[in-house]
A protein has these predicted regions:
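Soluble catalytic regions of large protease machineries
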Residues: 13, 21-207
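Single conserved hydrophobic/aromatic residue that forms the stacking wall/gate
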Residues: 1-7, 12
Length: 207
C-alpha cells in the first residue's frame, strides 16, 4: 500500500500523525481527539490535538500512562510501516519532541508525583535539565548512586511500557493506521468525529 512512498516526507508525516491519533483513539482513559492535522505550524510538521471533556485539576496514573503511549504513537507508526531503519528525525529527541515529552513525563511521575512503587511517595529533585534523572538528582540532592540508578530504571520502565503499549495497538490495528494516514494525505485535517467514522464505519469526509 505504501510501495514507492518510503522516504517521502509527506508519507512519513501522515503515518506519524496517524499513529498518534490511533493510539489516542484506543486509550479510553485519555482525552478525546479534537483534530489531527499534517499542516505545519511553527516547528511542528503536524499535530494531534486532544481536548478534555471537562476541566481537570489533576491526572490519574492511568491517564498519564495513556499519555506516554500516545507520545510514542508517531515513532512506532513509522517503525511499523517503514521499518526501524527508516524512522525519521521527527520521531527523535530534542526539546519539545515526542521522546522529550515522554521522558519528562515519566521523570515527573517517578520523582515528583510519587507514582513509582519502587521509589515511593517521595519528591527527589527539581532539576529538569538532564535526560538521565539520576544524574540531575545527584547534582541537586545528596542521594546515593544506588538511588539514582533506581530512579533511572523506573523512568525507563514507564517509557518502555508506553512504547510497548503503542506498538501493541498499532500492530494489531495496522489497517486502521493505513486508513487514517491515507485520509490525512487526502484531507490534511481530520476532526475526532471524522477519525471515529473512518475507523468504525469506514466512512470518509465528503469532499
Amino acid at each position: 500500500i505504501w510501495k514507492g512512498l518510503v522516504g517521502s516526507e509527506m508519507c512519513i508525516r501522515d503515518s506519524h500523525e496517524g499513529g498518534h491519533a490511533l493510539v489516542s483513539f484506543n486509550m479510553p482513559s485519555y482525552d478525546p481527539i479534537h483534530k489531527a492535522t499534517i499542516i505545519p505550524r511553527g516547528r511542528a510538521l503536524g499535530m494531534v490535538m486532544n481536548l478534555p471533556e471537562r476541566d481537570k485539576h489533576g491526572h490519574s496514573i492511568k491517564y498519564l500512562k495513556a499519555r506516554l503511549a500516545v507520545c510514542f504513537g508517531g515513532r512506532v507508526a513509522e517503525e511499523v510501516i517503514f521499518g526501524k531503519d527508516n524512522i525519521s528525525t521527527g520521531a527523535g529527541g530534542g526539546s519539545g519532541s515526542d521522546i522529550n515529552q515522554a521522558t519528562q513525563l515519566a521523570r515527573a511521575m517517578v520523582t515528583k508525583y510519587g507514582m513509582s512503587e519502587e521509589m515511593g511517595p517521595v519528591e527527589y529533585g527539581e532539576n529538569q535539565e538532564e535526560v538521565f534523572l539520576g544524574r540531575s538528582v545527584t547534582q541537586t540532592q545528596s542521594v546515593s548512586e544506588e538511588v539514582a540508578q533506581k530512579i533511572d530504571k523506573e523512568i525507563r520502565k514507564l517509557v518502555d511500557e508506553g512504547y510497548n503499549q503503542a506498538k501493541k495497538i498499532l500492530t494489531e490495528k495496522i489497517d486502521d493506521l493505513h486508513k487514517i494516514a491515507k485520509a490525512l494525505i487526502t484531507y490534511e485535517t481530520l476532526t475526532g468525529e471524522e477519525i471515529e467514522n473512518i475507523i468504525n464505519k469506514n466512512l470518509y469526509p465528503k469532499d
